[in-house]
Amino acid sequence: MKPGWILLFAASLMTAISVPATAATLQITMDNLVISPSEASAEVGDTIEWINKDVFVHTATARNGDFDINMPAKKTVTSVLKKAGTIEYYCRFHPNMKATLTVAP
């Protein structure tokens, strides 16, 4: 193998190794007083798009205190997951609206 090709191969290998993984975006919807999906999985660093399709204000309030997201009617709010774990959350205004989010490290 020619020295130039070795350098090119090494440079492309280093680029592939050093490129961080791209964070994902997960959509969670509040519609007709239901959270969908009711069970979701994500990773630390991922973004959650909380989409409120209802005419009511909703929250996504973690029972363990990890987050408390306020969602005005007919609006979308985003947040970034900062901590791993299984999080049960609900709407403070409509306590029957509940779901679980599992966040991997």
Model-derived regions, located:
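Extracytoplasmic copper-binding redox domains, predominantly the cupredoxin/blue-copper superfamily
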Residues: K2-L8, S18-P105
